């Protein structure tokens, strides 16, 4: 099964640890231009400058966001803004956050993981990727020779060996801690004890790895290994136990805008082949459609709210809705008329202001369903999973010159 390794991770200088939260950013694919501007203003050392820097009209082959990231990375290393650890270690990350008024903690191991082709059935994907995003990540890897963000992956951990280890280790004082503006608090521990390292490497040899967030980055690493450098055979990941109570799998809602009445009516009629319709009050169903494992959808327009319950022979709300959408809309119509959103309050606000015409509030897939489907090699419909919260970028960096 999976082979994991400690590594000489790069972190911000310990003298800057009180400012560490100002240096971090979300994953590259969820950073809007407005947020990017805010992160640039937050700190001259915010890692967005490395992970997904600004693009200028004057950019050319020698001066672009990739070359600027590479040069800045080298500069931060030279000036000891970033420091590479002397010895290979594992890192433990504990994230604390609030969801729907409840306080949660998620714990994970940061490690290097051997790269496996999907056909080897060791690292398992659950979604298709897009070429444009992989080209972007490839160019950054090639130019900067580093990975600034970690892939989030999960393991079944049936005997709870990983989560029990993490709970025990996080009972001591951390090496680093901080908070990320508008996100969450974090703590980091260093694992350099030989016996503990051996325990972890042996533990993962019995596990499959399920990619939770980071398919584009994983496939980019495979491509990099194939084209650029065969010895670059590992990728930095956060590995989380499925038994961690702080591992939240939330729903990704669907919103429609700009569809004509004919398409809308066709969509709703087609849904009746898969779902049983019943009227509900929005106020009663609002929270139900955000953090529940129940297999139903709440459909809302400006005039009514409807609960859609799966018929007996149908297994998944996401698959059923995806089947209906594909049968009614062309690929271009899907791109032009559907938005995906995990914030149900924000989506309802847009619906009330007539920015949207029809919304489907989705419940989360259960963890067991996710494991079962992915283990059998099934790819899930687009935007079926949201492992919340997304990992902050910049806590630990993987240097490709030091595999």
Task: Enumerate the predicted regions with their spans.
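Surface-exposed, charge/polar-rich loops and edge strands
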Residues: 1-403
